[in-house]
């Protein structure tokens, strides 16, 4: 039956079983011999021994993946969240990421807005009477309609682009002065129509025929 040799204690164990090896490694003499062995050798040699032991364990098993490290080709975190360790934070909203479509090549800094390669965002369409990219100016008291706000629509029955001509213009009859034929005075208070003809009372019923109202 094969035996296990301990390099630290320089002895052979009785059996090469896991239970016997664990019992020997937990012993007081074995632990003291391990400490003395690493104290005798130099620091550089001790580090090389530790690296060799670590590499042997890594060769036998697979490395545990780190959840913080994203695999190649993964999407970056959304805007507003910090980047993963070893990864640049996401660019601000409206700027393409490096290496993407219409973006800067990897390793190049992001140009500022308006610089070479990244134009300013398009301005808002200019308002009537306002500057390009700005808000419409407020109307003033002596400013005619249409400077900053749409004009007042014409009265009903006229086309949208119709302009009312001044009095006495060609093609339109002149307005008669008050008291002339064709001029209808404005109705008095409480009347919604033209004045009643003479001979009628205030009532809406017609008066008696002539001759009936005379005394006999």
Curated annotation (Swiss-Prot):
Q: Which GO terms describe its cellular component?
A: commitment complex; U1 snRNP; U2-type prespliceosome
- On the tree of life, the source organism's domain of life is Eukaryota
Keyword field: Metal-binding, Nucleus, Ribonucleoprotein, RNA-binding, Zinc, Zinc-finger
Name the coiled-coil region(s): none
- Which residue stretches does the UniProt record annotate as biased composition, category Pro residues? 68-80, 87-198, 206-216
Compartments reported by the entry: Nucleus
According to the UniProt record, where is the region Disordered? 68-216
Q: Which Pfam families match?
A: zf-U1 (PF06220)
The similarity annotation says:
Belongs to the U1 small nuclear ribonucleoprotein C family.
Summary of subunit composition and partner proteins: U1 snRNP is composed of the 7 core Sm proteins B/B', D1, D2, D3, E, F and G that assemble in a heptameric protein ring on the Sm site of the small nuclear RNA to form the core snRNP, and at least 3 U1 snRNP-specific proteins U1-70K, U1-A and U1-C. U1-C interacts with U1 snRNA and the 5' splice-site region of the pre-mRNA.
Q: Under which name does UniProt file this protein? A: U1 small nuclear ribonucleoprotein C
